[in-house]
Amino acid sequence: MHIVLDTNILVSAAWSPGRNASAILEAVFSRKHTPCYDARILAEYDRVLHYPKLKFTEWEINAILEPLVKYGLSVIPEPLLSVPFERDETDRKFYEVAKFCRAVLITGNLAHFPSEPDIMSPADFCRKYL
């Protein structure tokens, strides 16, 4: 199954081993699910994981990003400008990639996205697919 991970899922997985977000990342690393991304998403992952307040080491960041790239699907999605993103326009990229790949979008910020069946919380994804 193709999935798109909002950045908060990566941060949660690194901060909270043994919880839903880390179970999702483990499923990606074991190739049960294929992460989809584009250059904008990778840039955000890299930028956020390097925030000084998160205190992740370069090794930890690489341990997260390298398998995502290695096992993932890099795409160039079509813009979907007809869908409003009033809360956070920067989240549009995740939605565009998810729609392009027909993927499930997993986020801790459901309010930032349209209410659609393939956009779900980590808990809902784990309950349904893991």
Task: Give, region by region, the residue ranges found by the protein language model.
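Structured helix-beta-strand junction loops
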Residues: 30-32, 71, 101, 116
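Residues at secondary-structure transition points
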Residues: 19, 36, 56-59, 85, ...
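Active-site neighborhoods of divalent-metal-dependent phosphate/nucleic-acid chemistry enzymes
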Residues: 70-108
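Hydrophobic "anchor" residues on beta-strands that sit immediately upstream
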Residues: 2
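PIN/NYN-family metal-dependent endoribonuclease catalytic core
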Residues: 5, 15, 21-52
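Acidic, PIN/NYN-like endoribonuclease modules and their adjacent C-terminal/linker elements
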Residues: 102-130
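Extended, non-globular alpha-helical segments
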Residues: 39-69, 124, 128-130
